[in-house]
């Protein structure tokens, strides 16, 4: 029947789209490998690898399909696992000030909460939060006692999401509506969970460069 044909065809279409997605991925990897072979390094998208489709001149054989490839260069970000305490405290203090006078002490609560979230003990830092704090929430949960694995995890950590009971000392990453703030965007742009080497200053965001320059 026509309905049966429609039902079967939707899965064929899904498989076709998956094939096109993998083709675009192979193309992007191929372009990056070519630049690595020829130039030995990837230091800036302006080398030509930033737009694999334009560089390769290849398009889908199916005219009804359009490819779009977006590359995010993680090398221009700071490895989140290696930044020093004083730098991260200062980073949070600048965000907390939101353009007004910066008090370095204002960044400490966010750093302490972040560290307590990751460590395996129950010893609460001076301005941090351990399981006792999270167990008293309306929807209680526990700290994982491991490294933070993604940016969404900050929604769960004291101070980063908006807290109606403590509006002045919370919400630097998520506002009262649960939406990301400009500080969360800047944090995403500046820090990486994947990159582990030195920061590539050629692709570092303006916010990070400004922070480094004081």
Q: Could you tell me what each predicted segment is?
A:
Residues 1-214:
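Compositionally biased linear targeting/interaction segments
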């Amino acid at each position: 029947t026509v309905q049966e044909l429609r039902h079967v065809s939707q899965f064929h279409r899904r498989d076709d789209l998956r094939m096109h997605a993998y083709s675009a991925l192979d193309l992007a990897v191929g372009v990056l490998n070519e630049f690595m072979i020829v130039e030995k390094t990837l230091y800036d998208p302006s080398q030509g690898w930033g737009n694999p489709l334009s560089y390769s001149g290849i398009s889908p054989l199916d005219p009804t399909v359009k490819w779009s490839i977006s590359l995010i260069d993680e090398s221009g970000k700071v490895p989140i696992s290696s930044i020093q305490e004083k730098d991260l405290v200062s980073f949070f203090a600048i965000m907390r000030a939101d353009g007004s006078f910066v008090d370095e002490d204002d960044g400490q609560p966010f750093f302490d909460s972040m560290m307590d979230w990751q460590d395996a003990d129950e010893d609460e830092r001076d301005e941090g939060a351990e399981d006792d704090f999270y167990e008293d929430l309306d929807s209680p949960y526990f700290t994982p006692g491991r490294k933070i694995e993604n940016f969404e995890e900050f929604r769960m950590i004291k101070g980063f999401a908006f807290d109606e009971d403590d509006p002045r000392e919370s919400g630097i990453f998520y506002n009262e509506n649960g939406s990301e703030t400009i500080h969360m965007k800047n944090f995403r742009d500046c820090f990486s969970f994947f990159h582990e080497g030195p920061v590539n200053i050629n692709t570092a965001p303006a916010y990070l460069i400004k922070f480094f320059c004081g």
